[in-house]
Design a protein with these regions (language model features):
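ABC ATPase NBD coupling module
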Residues: 16-33, 57, 62-63, 180
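ABC ATPase "signature
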Residues: 170-171, 179, 248
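Conserved ABC ATPase signature
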Residues: 85-89, 93-95
Length: 271
């Protein structure tokens, strides 16, 4: 491993950088799991054995390890492939094995280093859906590294954008799109489909009452506009989880937010 030059990594009050080799080994076994870009499966082991590998490292008995691994094999949609070897699986299926292996250890932190980058677009979207569905239930801390901004905006609750090793902006997808920190970020996000990323909560006006179709706070602007068009209305009501009106949104504001900011003919404004 390459030793970091500076900084700290604090997990539950403990500085990972100050841990001994044995402490790091224990941290890796019990608190963190990883999903690799190139799958990292053991070619001579079956799907079931690969998924159970981390459990065996933790010292869990074969019977319990097999039972727990089977649960995650089922959850990622690989039931029936338990005795297959990695070479018999497609890339997407191999990555499902990798995800199941990481989840089987029940680690608090999941590190995913460009985990879906090697997959074709359709399978990549499918894996994103699987991850998001599982996260709805598991609520893990997931550190997802990607060069694909669309992927980051879709998956991330909090996003950090780096340039030359430095964090340029950190925030939720809505704030990054609505309030880019500098010219570099503005150029970085300029081709994003704002209508799919931005949600009504980012542009709504607070209101206790509003007319028109009702929509949830996380409704994408693209869908909100379609609802307004279908209803033949210029504005709609934004409702919270309890169904009560908390704001309103107008067609004009939605269209304005979806439009890419006009930069004219100037080129990048950063060095």
């Amino acid at each position: 491993m390459i030793e970091p030059t500076e900084g700290e990594v604090i997990v539950d009050g403990d500085n990972v950088m100050a841990m001994s080799i044995e402490e790091l080994r224990d941290f890796r076994r019990h608190k963190a799991s990883m999903v690799f870009q190139r799958f990292g499966l053991l070619p001579h082991r079956t799907v079931s054995q690969n998924v159970a590998y981390g459990l065996s490292i933790q010292g869990i008995g074969e019977g319990e390890a097999t039972e727990r691994s089977q649960r995650w094999i089922d959850r990622v949609g690989l039931a029936g492939f338990e005795q297959h070897f990695p070479a018999q699986l497609s890339g997407g299926m191999q990555q499902r094995v990798g995800l199941a292996r990481a989840l089987a250890t029940d680690a608090e932190i999941l590190l995913m280093d460009e985990a879906f980058s090697a997959l074709d677009p359709l399978i990549r979207t499918d894996m994103q859906n699987i991850l998001l569905d599982l996260q709805e239930e598991l609520h893990k801390t997931i550190v997802f590294i990607t060069h694909d901004l669309d992927e980051a905006l879709r998956i991330g609750d909090e996003i950090s954008i780096l340039r030359d090793g430095e964090v340029i902006q950190q925030g939720d997808p809505q704030s990054i799109i609505m309030k880019p920190a500098d010219d570099y970020i503005s150029d970085f996000i300029k081709d994003i489909n704002r209508g799919r990323v931005l949600e009504v909560r980012s542009i709504m006006e607070k209101a206790d009452r509003a007319s028109g179709p009702k929509m949830g706070i996380k409704t994408p602007l693209e869908d909100a506009l379609q609802q307004l068009v279908n209803a033949g209305k210029d504005s709609g009501a934004v409702v919270g989880d309890n169904g009560k009106t908390i704001g309103k949104i107008s067609m004009a504001n939605a269209i304005a937010a979806m439009a890419r900011p006009d930069r004219g003919d100037e080129g990048p404004r950063y060095k």
